Design a protein with these regions (language model features):
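Conserved beta-strand/loop elements of the cytosolic catalytic core of P-type E1-E2 ATPases, chiefly
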Residues: 78-82, 103
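Asp-based, Mg2+/Mn2+-dependent phosphohydrolase catalytic module
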Residues: 86-94, 106-209
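Surface-exposed cleft-lining segments at the edges of enzyme active sites
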Residues: 71-77
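A metal-dependent, Asp-based hydrolase signature
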Residues: 3-71, 83-86, 90-94
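Pocket-edge positions in alpha/beta enzyme catalytic cores
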Residues: 29-32, 77, 133-134, 196
Length: 209
């Protein structure tokens, strides 16, 4: 009999569901917000191992399930820009501001998602977890992105939605760390190291010096 993890997925992945059973959010302090692909794979594999499956089989099982999930992702392409993001990118482009992406996702997947949203060309540096030795909140990804964008730490502001992003910005010595949260009050509970918290890109104004 195949081992099956017990308990709700929402309990150990931090997923939030609506009454219809659809995922509508996730814990901003949890693994989906800050974990790398390898870390999330290990977390899921542990659940199978805890249910009695040998570790090597558990890892293979998770990778198989991930492959099936990615087929559906490729079909649906569920990547959409946050409200206000496109206008923000256009404003930055017109102002001559260099933009980069640093993410716990793989570089290839990130590039794909940016292409789906039609915003790939706005970024001159894309740094995924696979391009560095250490992930967030270590500043290595930021350091690489800055080098590729040819700007200094004093010229850079980081915008992110997890406190891991905020800590990474601090450790890199950036000018500021801006946290994005749907609600300012709840954002203050987990974006503890943000210099400023906004509800979205529409709250950020780009002005020429």
């Amino acid at each position: 009999m195949e081992a099956t993890p017990q308990g709700k997925v929402s309990d150990w992945l931090g997923l939030v569901y609506n009454k219809q059973g659809s995922v509508i959010g996730y814990d901003k302090t949890g693994p989906l917000a800050m974990g790398t692909e390898e870390e999330v794979t290990a977390l899921l594999a542990w659940r199978f191992y805890d249910a009695g499956m040998p570790w090597n089989e558990a890892v293979v099982k998770v990778r198989e399930l991930n492959a099936l999930a990615m087929i559906e992702v490729e079909r649906c392409r569920p990547a959409h820009p946050l409200p206000g993001l496109y206008d923000f990118l256009v404003s930055c482009s017109r102002a001559g501001i260099a933009l980069g992406v640093v993410t716990s996702d793989t570089t290839a997947e990130t590039l794909k998602h940016l292409e789906w949203m039609g915003i790939r060309n706005y970024f001159c540096s894309i740094v995924g977890r696979d391009r560095v030795g250490k992930g967030k909140p270590d500043p290595e990804m930021v350091t690489l992105a800055l080098r590729e964008m040819r700007i200094s730490t004093e010229e850079c502001i980081l915008i992110g939605d997890s406190n891991g992003d905020m800590i990474m910005a601090k450790r890199a010595g950036l000018q500021a760390a801006i946290g994005i949260a749907g609600d300012i009050t709840s954002g203050k509970e987990y974006l503890l190291d943000a210099d400023v918290i906004v509800t979205g890109y529409s709250d950020i104004t780009v002005q020429l010096a």
